Amino acid sequence: ASYSNASASDVSTAIDAALAAKPAWESLPFADRAAIFLKAADLIAGKYRYEIMAATMLGQGKNAWQAEIDSAAELVDFLRFNVQFAEELYAQQPQHNSPGVWNRVEYRPLEGFVYAVTPFNFTAIAGNLPGAPALMGNVVVWKPSDSAIASNWLLYNILLEAGLPKNVIQFVPGNPEEVTKVVLEHKQLAALHYTGSTAVFRKLYGAIATGVAEGRYQGYPRIVGETGGKNFHLIHSSADIENAAIQTVRGAFEYQGQKCSATSRAYIPKSVWPQFKEKLVKETSALSLGVPTDHKNFVGPVIHAGSFNKLSGVIDAAQNDSELELLVGGKHDNSTGYFIHPTIYATTNPRHKLLSTELFGPILTVHVYDDTASPAEAYADVCKLIDSTSEYGLTGSVFAADRAAVRFAEDALRNSAGNFYINCKSTGAVVGQQPFGGARASGTNDKAGGMNFMSRFVSARSIKEEFSPTTKVEYPSNEV
């Protein structure tokens, strides 16, 4: 299969077509818009379940389990729960009306169009970024990742089959910079909805800010973004060591660590390090690596040559780093695919760059903290270390049976992770259960998978109506 990249002229045409479709789409009753997305959810859950899973496996390198929980389960959850969240938002109305007065709030679609830029690593996110704004009555220009075209194109056609008018969401693959340049120059840009790298998001944020300063736009475009993470597992001496080690292996190496929430740094107390290390290395060494179509494989290839080159470069450089001890892995092979073996390093340097730099691959770095002399002080210090080591604030986990230790970490790390997990891995947020997003360099923390997220794609209008006429100009205080 092949596809064509959009030219600058194509992008302009797509924007014009979307804006032309806007009046009819936003005037359609919510129930009718919702029915389209609910039907799409049913089509994905049934008729197209295995086809969209296969497209995700073959195009994005996910094994069957990862494809199922993403392109089938989570995508369907987004489509269904977003309808519920929208209904909850619309129900937010003034609680008090004065005698003879009726107050109400209208949640209008944004004035203009939404630009959705989606990543390769989740078909569900690729559906949610254009889908959520469209559900709220917006029109969307959707630039998919060029590493996820197969699943994204299938999803787009499923939406059309479900009844989505063809111009409401414009599917516009192309060179990211060329497509974005046209979009950001358009006066009617109403919002950016983005998931991807921190560096690109910062660039887009700055470009939109420049446009605002120049008076380029008709308003102030909303910016909703979720980017990277340097997500942690903190182990307390009271933790269930087997559970903590297994959860760490899953968090670090499922889908080759190509999740913004993937576990990429772990902090282990010296008092339990021998047991933890033994289990960690044993479980990691046992992971099967190979093509996603062989269901026994836990680990598949990374997404493309650029990712392979970056990650293999990290592994090669680590061979000459005296501050790193290789515990397992450290191998890479691109002879039949872009394979990076699950790799774990231990470092004595609490500020090593591998503890602060997002790698987006199957590389975990461990720091052992000394809790033998003063356990409580060591635990407090490592919490400060975790909070200050990375610029990100996406996900993190604490493993402890001691409830005081859990409470301490929950408070000390309250700004270190937008999604904080207790005795479970740093990945796997479920729509409707754990709204997802982080702050600091990780994004705007608007929490996809919750009602507040939907509010980012509407512009509220307060309406007051009086039923009784006013009969005099003067107020009571004017009467003497």
At which residue positions do the language-model features occur?
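Conserved C-terminal structural/oligomerization subdomain of aldehyde/semialdehyde dehydrogenase
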Residues: 1-16, 20, 26-38, 48, ...
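Residue-level signal for inorganic ion chemistry
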Residues: 3, 18, 33, 56, ...
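Hydrophobic face of alpha-helices
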Residues: 8, 12-15, 34-41, 49, ...
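Conserved helix-loop functional segments at active or binding sites
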Residues: 20-27, 42-46, 50, 54, ...
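Rossmann-like NAD(P) dinucleotide-binding subdomain of oxidoreductase/dehydrogenase enzymes
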Residues: 57, 86-243, 296, 376, ...
